[in-house]
A protein has these predicted regions:
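Active-site rim/loop-helix segments in enzyme catalytic domains that contact anionic ligands
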Residues: 18-119, 141, 149
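A short helix->loop->beta-strand "cap" motif at the edges of active sites that frequently abuts
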Residues: 51, 163-167
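Short acidic, glycine/proline-rich loop/turn micro-motifs
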Residues: 65-68, 179-183
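Active-site adenylate/phosphate-handling loop in enzymes that bind or generate adenylated species
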Residues: 115-161
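Functional cores that coordinate and move charged inorganic groups
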Residues: 136, 141, 170, 185-187
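C-terminal accessory domains and tails appended to enzymatic cores
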Residues: 152-157, 162-164, 179, 185-288
């Protein structure tokens, strides 16, 4: 019984940085470009405000191309990830797990726990465990499984355990099964949308080669670099759904919320700390 109440206490106290300290955000994706798709705009805003952001690709992306494979592709995708990080002003780690082979094993879970602790994360971003692709699906499971373990000293004992469980958030993904994402937090991207597209543009192997090829639309990709970015912006800026619009209005007020054209949205995971609205505003200082 005592342990139950202790866990509830950990979940209801959101991790807040001390006055004047940086907010520390770590985002997990299955492949080197996944974090960028779901959170590059939010990352840019955090970075511009002097906070610390790290993207982590849980696999090395060595299978996602129609021509390149293995080590050659992994090295190219690492270079692309580092260029994206440079453009956003953040850190980017790419782990060595193979693309298409990720499993929610204890070994990979320990990698996730270690990274969250080493980053001393206040906020952890990850996919929901319901993707069509097994790698993002299992990335979601791995991060969920790490959520409580980051405060357990005997697990990964070589890295000091966190004192409080961070806020864990799911990316918006568009999937309806088992249930659609609930946009608890919606971030207005109008001031940084070009920076987000610039980050995506770093991943040439994906957005201009592999993904158009696998969709049967490679011939639609423009050759001119400036035209490519305009094309990519159209591909990667979804329409704002009514529930997202309502969330934007909640956080930004009617004028800014209703005029927003671009966004990223997140759902609070019940396995992490449960912040109230006041604490969300402290952790997301751009919500104003």
């Amino acid at each position: 019984l005592h342990m139950k109440w202790f866990v509830l206490l950990l979940l209801t106290v959101a991790v807040l940085p001390a006055q004047g300290q940086k907010i520390r955000v770590i985002a997990f994706g299955a492949h080197p470009d996944d974090c960028d798709i779901r959170s590059a705009g939010t990352a840019a805003l955090f970075a511009q405000m002097g906070n610390a952001v790290e993207f982590v690709s849980v696999t090395n992306g060595d299978a996602g191309h129609q021509v390149l494979h293995g080590k050659e592709l992994a090295e190219r995708r690492l270079r692309e990830a580092k260029e994206s990080a440079r453009r956003l002003g953040i850190e980017y780690q790419v782990l060595t797990n193979h693309d298409g082979e990720l499993l929610p094993s204890p070994e990979v879970r320990k990698q996730i726990i270690r990274l969250i602790r080493e980053w001393k994360a206040d906020i952890v971003l990850a996919p929901r465990p319901n993707d069509y692709h097994p790698d993002p699906r299992y990335t979601g499971v791995l991060v969920q499984d790490a959520a409580y373990m980051v405060v357990v000293p005997s697990v990964v004992p070589e890295v000091p355990a966190l004192h409080k469980i961070p806020v864990f958030l799911y990316y918006d993904d568009g999937f309806q099964w088992l249930n659609p994402l609930r946009p608890d937090i919606a971030v207005r991207l109008d001031d940084v949308i070009d920076k987000k597209i610039d980050a995506l543009d770093s991943h040439v192997s994906q957005f201009y080669e592999w993904l158009p090829w696998v969709a049967g639309k490679l011939e639609t990709v423009p050759k001119d670099p400036s035209e490519r970015k305009a094309w990519l912006k159209i591909q990667r800026t979804p329409a704002i759904k009514p529930d997202v619009r309502a969330s934007l209005v909640k956080w930004y007020g009617a004028e800014k919320g209703n005029s927003a054209q671009y966004y990223e949205a997140f759902e609070i995971c019940e396995y992490g700390a449960q912040p109230d609205d006041h604490r969300i505003r402290e952790l997301f200082p751009m919500l104003r």
